[in-house]
Amino acid sequence: MGSAIFEPGPLSLLNLACSNLTERYDGPSPLSASTPGPSPDRPGSATMSSPLSSPTGISYQSLLSGILPAAMFPYGYPPVGYMYPTGFPTLAAIQSGHLAFRQLVPTLPFNTVKSSEGQVKEVVSTQSQKKPLAFSIDSILRPDFGKETNEVKRRHASPHREEPKKKVQYIEQMKKKEEIKEEARTESRLSSSSKDSVPDNDKINPPLPPEASKWPAWVFCTRYSDRPSSGRSPRCRRMKKDKAITPDEKRPRTAFTAEQLSRLKHEFNENRYLTERRRQDLARELGLHENQIKIWFQNNRAKLKKSSGQKNPLALQLMAQGLYNHSTIPTEDDEDDEISSTSLQARIE
């Protein structure tokens, strides 16, 4: 009750550690020893030249007795993992042997521990200034990413070596185009009857200059090709026939024999419409073409319909409903034509 516990500040503890930690601990740690703690008789054990004391004159034992009773620790030092009070972790660990002085030195490379502060900074700075990976995230996000590689490629590139290859490719392309043109000429000469109708491909499609070898191959298949889709003239044109057909070129009417006509009339009386199988058999028997028999049946149906005057039953049904009425009414012009035709017949007679 009467004695007050002294709690030193952080500044006094720092002075205490800097003034009294003069010797380096080289002995084994109690954690790795088989005995509870280091023995003073053993070589290499930790020994302190003088008891720890603060600049204010208060001994460390007096500071420790008020906060950390000695009865708490069975072996004379705090156990592993013990939570020290605020301000005493470093001093208590050194006093108990858990912490050696070398552990207070910052972890640096082996060759830099013995060097001065300036050399340490220099080594660390050189390690931090190492060249980053070529494809790391930092290098990719840099604004000059890819510039160095492009410059190296430009230096090592040799455009002059590729010129002979391009020349060889151009010569091969020209040979192929000449072969295609020759084939087109022969085809056009064979297809057309007159040589004047064949266009001159050399005039329409002149050979390409040597500069054309700079273009890729697909260009020659589009713009520079001689196909109709390229916008230029085709390889060979088919001459259009004249619309005015002479009478000699008209198809002559089929002259049926008496036997053929009698057989066709007989078949027409039986059935006015022919099936495909029946039409083929009839054409084989009569020695005619199927189209000739088909047209003859169509003409006879039209004649019969015109002579009988009968209308289609479907047309009659629609006319009864008022939906269909194609009946014609004779006009005055038609009557005048009939009168003139009758007068002409009377004069001829």
Swiss-Prot record:
Molecular functions per Gene Ontology: DNA-binding transcription factor activity, RNA polymerase II-specific; RNA polymerase II cis-regulatory region sequence-specific DNA binding
Gene3D superfamilies per the UniProt record, alphabetical: Homeodomain-like
Residue ranges: DNA binding: 249-308
Biological process according to GO: neuron differentiation
One Pfam family, short name: Engrail_1_C_sig
Gene Ontology cellular-component terms listed: nucleus
Signal peptide extent: none
Family annotation (SUPFAM superfamilies): Homeodomain-like (SSF46689)
Main subcellular localisation: nucleus
Region of interest called Disordered, as start-end residue ranges on this chain: 26-53, 146-210, 228-252, 327-349
UniProt keyword annotations, A-Z: Developmental protein, DNA-binding, Homeobox, Nucleus
Residue stretches of biased makeup (Basic and acidic residues): 173-188, 242-252
Localization per Swiss-Prot or TrEMBL: Nucleus
Domain of life: Eukaryota
Annotated family: Belongs to the engrailed homeobox family.
PANTHER family in the cross-refs: HOMEOBOX PROTEIN ENGRAILED, HOMEOBOX PROTEIN INVECTED
Name of the featured protein: Homeobox protein engrailed
